[in-house]
Amino acid sequence: MQLSIQAVEVLLIMAIKFTQTTLDKVEKIIEESGYVIRYERGNFQSGYCILQAKKVVVLNKFFQTEGKINTLIDLMPQLEINFDALTHDSQKLFDEVMAIGNDKQRQLNLQFVHA
């Protein structure tokens, strides 16, 4: 069964609620892997900056909760997440986020192949 990009995005929205609690859980995954998350003002074209050597993620502080969650989720594949260092709850959420992200990426790849 093939899902459209919109269907995958709807599944993401259904699976993840855009609340402060969810933001806290997503931040916890990143922090448990040794990263520091900072919210700052700045001219971020993409809304974020990663300082890999210092394990610092800087996000635009003017993002709403949904934007912060989406940005952190989009960043996860670029970060060195230590799965074994995560708590059980964080591991479950990380697996869920990565599975949804992989489905979305597959759909994007299929879209380019068929274009």
Which residue stretches match the model-derived regions?
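Anionic group-transfer/hydrolysis microenvironments
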Residues: 42, 62, 76
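Active-site recognition of the HExxH zinc-binding catalytic motif
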Residues: 70-78
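Metalloprotease/metallohydrolase-associated module, dominated by Zn2+-dependent proteases
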Residues: 15-51, 57-58, 83-115
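Acidic, Ala/Val/Gly-enriched low-complexity intrinsically disordered segments
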Residues: 7-10
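Short pre-active-site segment immediately N-terminal to the catalytic Zn-binding motif
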Residues: 58-70
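Cationic, low-complexity basic patches in intrinsically disordered or flexible, solvent-exposed regions
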Residues: 3
